[in-house]
């Protein structure tokens, strides 16, 4: 039975963005369509055989209030998907990402995009594979607490479980429900960093 890596893409990239661009400088936005995810994960998972790598992303749709930004994000995701597939990942588009306008207390409108349903798809896929006896080990690259119930179910199905998180604010609940915890160091994220986009 295979060892499978489940990557919660938005969760992973959000954590990495904070490490690579902690001040949230717009001109230094990280271009993940150039990031060497494969080398990073090969390093932190050294000694562990990974037979399949699943990278989950929220499915983007164009919303009438956010048409321009939605189309930009869809193109960014297309480039990211091509980049990930070239590195041996199977990209799974799940749930949805919707843009909407929020008004702050001062009356300013902000365009916000929220992802929903990806964690549900990861949980369903893990449990389905476990019930089919089609998985030996699940490596969970996500710090989403909503996955704890699914990970507990994997335990009852006899599946080995590894939580892959970050040294900054690891998820204690996922650490508790897995056999092993591997934490990615900030220096390792930086080691395989893509060129940050700059508008010089």
Q: What kind of region is each of these model predictions?
A:
Residues 1-111, 160, 165:
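Domain-level signal for Mg2+-assisted phosphodiester chemistry and nucleotide/NA-binding surfaces
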Residues 89-200:
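Nuclease catalytic cores that cleave nucleic-acid phosphodiester bonds
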């Amino acid at each position: 039975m295979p060892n499978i890596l489940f990557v919660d893409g938005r969760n992973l990239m959000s954590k990495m963005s904070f490490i690579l661009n902690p001040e949230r400088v717009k001109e230094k936005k990280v271009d993940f369509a150039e990031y060497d995810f494969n080398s990073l994960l090969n390093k932190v998972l050294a000694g562990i055989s990974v037979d399949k790598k699943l990278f989950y992303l929220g499915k983007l749709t164009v919303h009438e209030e956010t048409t321009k930004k939605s189309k930009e994000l869809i193109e960014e995701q297309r480039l990211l998907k091509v980049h990930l597939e070239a590195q041996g990942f199977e990209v799974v588009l799940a749930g949805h990402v919707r843009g909407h306008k929020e008004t702050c207390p001062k009356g300013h409108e902000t365009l916000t995009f929220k992802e929903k349903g990806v964690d549900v798809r990861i949980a369903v896929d893990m449990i389905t594979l476990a019930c089919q006896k089609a998985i030996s080990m699940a490596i969970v690259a996500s710090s989403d607490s909503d996955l704890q119930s699914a990970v507990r179910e994997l335990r009852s199905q006899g599946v080995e479980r590894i939580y892959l998180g970050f040294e900054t604010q690891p998820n204690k609940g996922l650490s508790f429900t897995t056999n092993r915890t591997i934490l990615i160091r900030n220096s390792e994220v930086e080691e395989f960093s893509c060129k940050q986009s700059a508008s010089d």
